């Protein structure tokens, strides 16, 4: 079993987006710690299976971040289950999880399931609109969410998601200072080695996604954060 606490860098691939064989090979051979498959729109059983089968040829951990029940399938090393803490819709807190457990609970290996305390911070992002997230958050709000995740819910992961834009470093830093047990994931807008380095100095693990499809060379440079210690 892989130890996710050792992961500093994850590439996130969207099954609804095209990636060439050459680019996928470069991503999977880049020394990233893991590949995560996940997205918001058009995540289907077919495109998840297709992408999974392409990535499975490489010897690195493979994660499915669950966005709907229909696309859940065996074959992944881990299943990351988001609970969107700042969503106004209970479905994105635990409603979808409840339905998944009713359907698959008898066959789940819970050692493979990681619950993520998500906070969505970009009001203009698809994920914010889809999850009906309240993104008007102060630093104090984020600190309170961090305390909730770390001390009360005791979730293994807190994911600060800026989805499409580079986040407020001071707010991410404030969250980090309240997490003593929970692992801090940061995702959103990382498009350069400098931004990757800046966020990796704060978060335990950075997630790099969109830049893969815009500039593969810049995406690959973000892996250099692994050369330095946090």
UniProtKB/Swiss-Prot annotation:
GO molecular-function term, one example from the UniProt record: heptaprenylglyceryl phosphate synthase activity
Keyword tRNA processing belongs to the record: no
Root EC class: transferase
Keyword Lipid metabolism: yes
Cofactor annotation: Mg(2+)
Binding site for sn-glycerol 1-phosphate: 12, 159-164, 189, 209-210
Catalytic activity: sn-glycerol 1-phosphate + all-trans-heptaprenyl diphosphate = 3-heptaprenyl-sn-glycero-1-phosphate + diphosphate
Record GO biological process: glycerophospholipid biosynthetic process
E.C. numbers: 2.5.1.n9
Name of a matching Pfam family: PcrB
Record's keyword terms, sorted: Lipid biosynthesis, Lipid metabolism, Magnesium, Metal-binding, Phospholipid biosynthesis, Phospholipid metabolism, Transferase
Pathway note: Membrane lipid metabolism; glycerophospholipid metabolism
Domain of life of the native organism: Bacteria
Gene3D superfamilies: FMN-linked oxidoreductases
Binding site for Mg(2+): 14, 40
Subunit structure and binding partners: Homodimer.
Function description: Prenyltransferase that catalyzes in vivo the transfer of the heptaprenyl moiety of heptaprenyl pyrophosphate (HepPP; 35 carbon atoms) to the C3 hydroxyl of sn-glycerol-1-phosphate (G1P), producing heptaprenylglyceryl phosphate (HepGP). This reaction is an ether-bond-formation step in the biosynthesis of archaea-type G1P-based membrane lipids found in Bacillales.
Family note: Belongs to the GGGP/HepGP synthase family. Group I subfamily.
Cited HAMAP family: GGGP_HepGP_synthase (MF_00112)
Protein name (record): Heptaprenylglyceryl phosphate synthase
Organism: Staphylococcus aureus (strain MRSA252)
Recorded name of the encoding gene: pcrB
């Amino acid at each position: 079993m892989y130890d996710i606490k050792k992961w500093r860098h994850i590439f996130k691939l969207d099954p609804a987006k095209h990636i060439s064989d050459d680019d996928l090979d470069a991503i999977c051979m880049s020394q990233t710690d893991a590949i995560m498959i996940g997205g918001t729109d058009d995540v289907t059983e077919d495109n998840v299976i297709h992408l999974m089968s392409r990535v499975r040829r490489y010897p690195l951990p493979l994660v499915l971040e669950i966005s709907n029940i229909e696309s859940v399938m065996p074959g992944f090393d881990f299943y990351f289950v988001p609970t969107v803490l700042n969503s106004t819709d209970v479905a994105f807190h635990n409603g979808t999880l409840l339905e998944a457990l009713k359907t698959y609970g008898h066959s789940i290996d819970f050692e493979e399931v990681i619950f993520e305390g998500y906070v969505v911070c970009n009001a203009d992002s698809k994920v914010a609109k889809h999850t009906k997230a309240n993104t008007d958050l102060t630093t104090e709000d984020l600190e309170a969410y961090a305390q909730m995740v770390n001390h009360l819910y005791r979730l293994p992961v807190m994911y600060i998601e800026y989805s499409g834009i580079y986040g407020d470093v001071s707010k991410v830093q404030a969250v980090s200072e309240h997490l003593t047990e929970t692992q801090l994931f940061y995702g959103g807008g990382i498009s350069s080695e400098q931004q990757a380095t800046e966020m990796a100095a704060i978060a335990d693990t950075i997630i790099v996604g969109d830049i893969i499809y815009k500039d593969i060379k810049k995406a690959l440079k973000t892996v250099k954060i692994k050369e330095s210690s946090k």
